Amino acid sequence: DDVTDGCALAEGAQRVDAPKGAVYRFNQSPKECVAWLTSGADCKALGATELARWFLTEEGLSTKQLGSWLGGNSELQVAALRAFAGELDFGEMAVVDALRYFLSLFKLPGEAQMIDRIMQAFADRWAAVRADETLTADVVYVLAFSLIMLNTDLHNPQIAPDRKMTREQFVRNNRGIGVGGTD
C-alpha cells in the first residue's frame, strides 16, 4: 500500500498537527481515527478543513485508506473532501494534468458512488479555479470520468489489445459534452 508523502498542500495553507499515533490509527481504521481527531479528546478537535490539511501534509497516511475515507458519504466526509479539493491550486493546469495530480494524492476507491463524489469535488474545484465558460464543472465531471475509463481500459490486462479503446472511439464517446452540446 502506498503512503502519502505529505507535500501536497496548496501554497500558503497551514500545516495541521495531530497527536502522536494518529497516522498509525488512521491507517488501521480511518473512521475511528477521524472520530478521535474530531472529538477533541486528546487534542483540539479538528473540523473538515483541518482534516483536509492534515491529509495533505501528513506523511505516511495510507493512500488506499485516504481514498476510501474521502469517498464516503457522511456529512463530515463530504465536507472534508470538498475542503481537500479546495486546498489544491490547479493554477493553469489542463484538466488531464489537474486530474492526474489530484489522483496522485490518494488511491481512487472502486465503488462507483465514491468515485462519483470524488470526481464531482474535483470538477467543482477545477471549474472554480479556472473560470472557463466552455469547461464548466459539469463538463469537467464528464470528461474526468471519461479519462478514468480510458485509463482503466488502457491498463487493464484483461482487455485484449485489439479491444482497447481507440482515439477515435474516445473522441466519439465525448462528442457533445461541452456547454450546449458542443465539442
Task: Identify what each model region corresponds to.
Residues 130-136:
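A short glycine/serine-rich beta->alpha loop
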Residues 1-125, 132, 141, 152-183:
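Catalytic and GAP-homology cores of small GTPase regulators
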